[in-house]
Amino acid sequence: MIIKRDMRQDKRAAPKAPINENISAREVRLIGADGEQIGIVSIDEALRIAEEAKLDLVEISADAVPPVCRVMDYGKSIFEKKKQIAAAKKNQKQIQVKEIKFRPGTEEGDYQVKLRNLVRFLSDGDRAKVSLRFRGREMAHQELGMELLKRVEADLQEYGSVEQHPKMEGRQLIMVIAPKKKK
């Protein structure tokens, strides 16, 4: 026997607050539509006040004794909340880690091109991972790689700061540079 379930149902948002007749408490601490404290009233009185204002009675805090309820337009408050979440999500910037690879024998022209790319990454607000790969006998001259990474660090001083100092990982020397905070 196969039981089919509607998968969209499982992706429901947070449980909705009880409104109007769905509030189970006998008396509630009521907050008016304009935010003023009305006080502790019976649920029938609170529903009457909400109905007179042509608004909903929404349970805000069920944990309090008695529960806190507010007179408000429930549909409008949900819309405003969704709008705030969307605006916050839109304003978030995903920080990426961009990688530039060097070799111990990187020539001056290549060095300048790679440095320009690092400056661009840091200016865009991304973190930059500088990796220096050793091959074969180059492992015997790790100090050359350290000098190169120190030079990169010095050249990028005004654009970013070292987040992770150079360290060996297998045959690679890796350093991470974070962008300077914009004022």
Curated annotation (Swiss-Prot):
Pfam families: IF3_C, IF3_N. Gene3D superfamilies: Translation initiation factor 3 (IF-3), C-terminal domain, Translation initiation factor 3 (IF-3), N-terminal domain. Its main location: cytoplasm. InterPro entries: T_IF-3_C_sf, T_IF-3_N_sf, Translation_initiation_fac3_CS, Translation_initiation_fac_3, Translation_initiation_fac_3_C, Translation_initiation_fac_3_N. Keywords: Cytoplasm, Initiation factor, Protein biosynthesis. Monomer. NCBIfam families: infC. Belongs to the IF-3 family. This is Translation initiation factor IF-3. The lineage of its organism: Bacteria, Pseudomonadati, Pseudomonadota, Gammaproteobacteria, Pseudomonadales. The gene is infC.
